[in-house]
Amino acid sequence: MNDVRLADFRAESLQFDMNHHFQPKENENLQLSIKLDQRVRMSSTPKEPVFLNIRVTVFDNAEVNNYPFEIIADVTGVFFIEAEGSDREAVLRDNGMVMLLPYVRAMISQLVSLANLPTPVILPPLDPSQMQPVEPEQAQ
């Protein structure tokens, strides 16, 4: 049985950058541009916590792509996993992401709200299978 428990999470970095050169196009409904990256850090000891870092970027390269702003939310979750061997990383990538994403979505919505923009940004539920792979790091 594979059991995953989210013990804690923290925002490593929350960045909001307004694009003051943004030129809205008339009658255009701007679609959200979302990029997801993840990194896993774990020890070889099964009882030790494992760490899943998620970086969500909304409107990447805002000035170049003519987006109104850019948000980067970098969040790390601390998990305990009941699984054996190499299955631990696969279990974390599949289940940990699903557990952590609602918190990341809320953080991003709050950033936009605090920026006092006229239109709220609420991210849709995100699909972990759309992730862009990042080289995993091994814990010391």
Map each language-model feature to its residues:
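N-terminal intrinsically disordered, cationic/polar leader segments
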Residues: 1-98, 106-140
